C-alpha cells in the first residue's frame, strides 16, 4: 500500500483534454449562477438511451466493435447490481445535488457475482472505447505505479480486455510523472504536455475527445507526482450539444 494513511497528502486537480484537430452519461450542463439550465444524465438502463448514446459514439468515429463491447459491460454492470438506484428510463435532469446511490448495496451485489473482479474503472472504460484511436511511441517511458487497481481489474476480468500492445498504450497514456513542489497550475500543465509529447501520445481518426482529470499528489518538497485520477469520453451530437461518457464506479 502507498503511504496515504501515514503522511499528509496535498492533492490538486487539473483537467486536460486530448482533443482531435456505467455508468453515467451526461448531456450538457451550464455551470453558472445566472442560468437555470442544467444538463441531464442516464445510467443506460433502457434500450432507447443506449441506442441514442451508441449513435453519438459511432457518429464521432468510434469503432462499432468497441462501442458494442462497452455496452455489453454496461448491461452486465446494471444487471449485476439489479439497477439499484439507477435512472430506469432515458435521461434525468440534474439538480443542484449530485445523484445519490446506495453504494453498500451495489457493492454487496457486485461482490456476490464477482468476488475477485473489482470491475472496470473510468480509465479502463474510456480507453476501451478509444483504444484503436490512440497511439504512443513504442519505447515510451512508463510509470504505472498508480495503476495497481487497473492492473488488478484487468488480471481478474472475466475476459481479456487488451492485447500486450494496447496495455502498453494504456500505461503510457495514464503514466504517473514527477512534477515540481508548487501550486502553479501552468507548471503542471507544461509537465503533462511535455510527457505526452515525448511519448508521442496522439489521438486521430475521431471527433471524440479523451477528457482526463490530473491530480497533483504532494508529500513534501521532494515527492510530487501527477497522475490521472479520472477519465471520460466527450463526443459532439448532431443537435450541437455534447455528450460525456464516464464510469463513476468500479
Where are these regions (language model features)?
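Sec-dependent N-terminal signal peptides of Gram-positive bacterial secreted proteins and lipoproteins
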Residues: 7-29
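Cysteine-nucleophile amide-bond enzymes
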Residues: 24, 30-250
Amino acid at each position: 500500500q502507498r503511504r496515504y494513511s501515514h503522511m499528509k497528502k496535498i492533492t490538486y486537480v487539473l483537467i486536460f483534454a486530448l482533443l482531435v484537430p456505467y455508468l453515467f452519461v451526461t448531456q450538457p450542463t451550464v455551470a453558472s449562477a445566472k442560468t437555470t439550465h442544467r444538463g441531464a444524465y442516464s445510467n443506460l438502463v433502457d434500450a432507447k438511451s443506449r441506442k441514442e448514446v451508441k449513435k453519438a459514439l459511432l457518429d464521432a468515429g468510434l469503432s462499432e466493435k468497441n462501442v458494442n463491447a462497452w455496452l455489453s459491460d454496461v448491461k452486465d454492470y446494471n444487471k449485476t447490481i439489479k439497477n439499484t438506484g439507477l435512472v430506469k428510463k432515458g435521461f434525468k435532469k440534474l439538480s443542484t445535488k449530485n445523484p445519490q446511490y446506495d453504494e453498500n448495496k451495489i457493492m454487496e451485489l457486485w461482490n456476490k457475482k464477482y468476488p475477485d473482479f473489482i470491475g472496470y474503472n473510468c480509465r479502463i472504460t474510456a480507453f476501451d472505447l478509444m483504444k484503436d484511436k490512440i497511439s504512443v511511441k513504442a519505447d515510451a517511458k512508463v510509470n504505472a505505479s498508480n495503476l495497481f487497481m487497473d492492473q488488478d481489474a484487468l488480471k481478474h476480468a472475466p475476459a481479456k480486455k487488451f492485447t500486450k500492445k494496447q496495455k502498453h498504450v494504456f500505461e503510457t497514456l495514464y503514466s504517473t510523472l514527477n512534477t515540481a513542489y508548487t501550486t502553479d497550475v501552468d507548471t503542471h500543465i507544461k509537465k503533462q504536455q511535455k510527457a505526452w509529447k515525448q511519448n508521442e501520445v496522439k489521438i486521430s481518426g475521431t471527433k471524440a475527445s479523451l477528457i482526463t482529470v490530473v491530480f497533483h499528489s504532494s508529500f513534501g518538497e521532494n515527492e510530487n507526482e501527477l497522475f490521472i485520477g479520472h477519465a471520460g469520453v466527450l463526443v459532439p451530437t448532431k443537435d450541437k450539444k455534447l455528450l460525456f461518457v464516464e464510469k463513476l464506479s468500479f
